[in-house]
């Protein structure tokens, strides 16, 4: 239990990929899953609360329905497979955890449940109560109703968002690969990266966009995106191989993405968000001011795009096109556009009412 022991990680999120749970024929790898349940029980007895983000519903449902391409030939096939497979998946989890004396609970979430603040808080409260009761939540995206436009798209990022909602200190992404390499691990001389202190352009360049199994949807790009979200919320994230028995109780080789520091709940939620309703483009002076801890003033904004209301999440973009921050708008889109580049006196004339202190206040903003 060397990775994220209970003493330093009271709450742990474990994500399990489809290729680990389901064999190429679409059947559950029950013996392997029984070992995972034993690992979770061992950690629970040591005082750790564990939640599982479990893939596999589409793969299981596709087999039962006889759908081609693992149920991914169309969105409708994937939704039907997910609806069918979720029952089978939850039943298996309940059985293997029950054999260890643990109670399983199912939580199906959509992107909106974790992107909209009120729904996020509700989901977080449910998750917290389940964990405090000693229950093992089994979480998955509700693929039976989600569409391409309103879905996470992979369970790696979902696991990171769940970690944030649960205030977990650690996330383990169990996969068919044992971590990050400086190039495709199939190439000669590929070097395994054990510890990542900062996710920069060089780390992102190492990501492989493919999924080795052909069964899931999360390649290394999605795992690095998940690490960004988890680290911003103060949680460390490890990518580890699940191609061994009882991977949570062995010192399996892994890549660890280290969280720099904790984050406030609201700022962690902002940083982890996957969607923004609009964007503000700002000049170089405004970028410097934000880095220095200032709020975003209208005078530093050069362009406004998107349709948004007051309180919506906005991306804040520098002159080079890079997203430098994210925050909650103090204005609806039309009013924000009306005061672009203006000082305070000119803003009041343009709006017809006294302007707010900033377009995005520093208390409602996080640097990226």
From Swiss-Prot:
Binding site for substrate: 55, 143, 155
Pathway terms, separated by semicolons: Amino-acid biosynthesis; L-proline biosynthesis; L-glutamate 5-semialdehyde from L-glutamate: step 1/2
InterPro entries, alphabetized: AceGlu_kinase-like_sf, Asp/Glu/Uridylate_kinase, Glu/AcGlu_kinase, Glu_5kinase, Glu_5kinase/COase_Synthase, Glutamate_5-kinase_CS, PUA, PUA-like_sf
Cellular localization per UniProt: Cytoplasm
First-level EC class: transferase
Reaction catalyzed: L-glutamate + ATP = L-glutamyl 5-phosphate + ADP
BP terms from Gene Ontology: L-proline biosynthetic process
Residues holding ATP: 15, 175-176, 217-223
Recorded superkingdom: Bacteria
Entry's Gene Ontology cellular component terms: cytosol
Molecular function as annotated in GO: ATP binding; glutamate 5-kinase activity; RNA binding
Domain PUA: 277-354
Keywords: Amino-acid biosynthesis, ATP-binding, Cytoplasm, Kinase, Nucleotide-binding, Proline biosynthesis, Transferase
Enzyme Commission (EC) number: 2.7.2.11
Entries under Gene3D superfamilies matching the protein: Acetylglutamate kinase-like (3.40.1160.10), PUA domain (2.30.130.10)
Annotated family: Belongs to the glutamate 5-kinase family.
Known function: Catalyzes the transfer of a phosphate group to glutamate to form L-glutamate 5-phosphate.
Name listed for the protein in its UniProt record: Glutamate 5-kinase
